[in-house]
Structure formats: C-alpha cells, structure tokens
C-alpha cells in the first residue's frame, strides 16, 4: 500500500471506531480514488465515504533555515454497515 502510512489512534479516532469510521495518515500526493482503491483491495471492505484534511505543519529550524516536517494528510474512511477492519476494531467491554 503505497499511499497509506499508518492508522491513527487518537481520542477522536477511537470514538469514531464505534461509527464504523477508520482514520489513516496518507501521503499528501495520493488521490482519494487511489486511497479508496487501496483500502478496498487490502482490507476487503466497501468504502462509502471519505473525508480528508491536512494537519497544521510543525516548524523545524536547522540553524538559520526554517522548514516544516509534516508531509501527509489524514483520511477518515467510512465503511458500509457489516464491514470492519479486524485489527483496528474496538473491543467491547
């Protein structure tokens, strides 16, 4: 999976697991259709909606030069009812 970096586990993303929504950080150059294709192919699920946003960049100074560190987007992927991604499923307590 070229475009997907890793799954994100924040308070919000863990809360969204109950709504069958999964959060991933993806390469900034990847398109929405590529990400949808990779998720459906790799996890064998059906995607019904995708939301994406860019995170604010963090500054990084190396002597006199100021740069930034983040080069990715965050995608929130909603799956059809009945589908789930097993390693990321929330445990019921």
Swiss-Prot record:
Keyword Cell inner membrane: no
Localization per record: Plastid, Chloroplast
GO aspect biological process, one term: translation
One of the record's GO cellular component terms: chloroplast
Residues that span the membrane, as ranges: none
Keywords per UniProt: Chloroplast, Plastid, Ribonucleoprotein, Ribosomal protein, RNA-binding, rRNA-binding
Coiled-coil segments: none
Matching InterPro entries: Nucleotide-bd_a/b_plait_sf, Ribosomal_uL23-like, Ribosomal_uL23/eL15/eS24_sf, Ribosomal_uL23_CS
GO MF annotations, alphabetized: mRNA binding; rRNA binding; structural constituent of ribosome
Similarity annotation: Belongs to the universal ribosomal protein uL23 family.
Assembly and interaction partners: Part of the 50S ribosomal subunit.
PANTHER family to which the protein is assigned, alphabetical: 60S RIBOSOMAL PROTEIN L23A
Function: Binds to 23S rRNA.
Protein name in UniProt: Large ribosomal subunit protein uL23cz/uL23cy
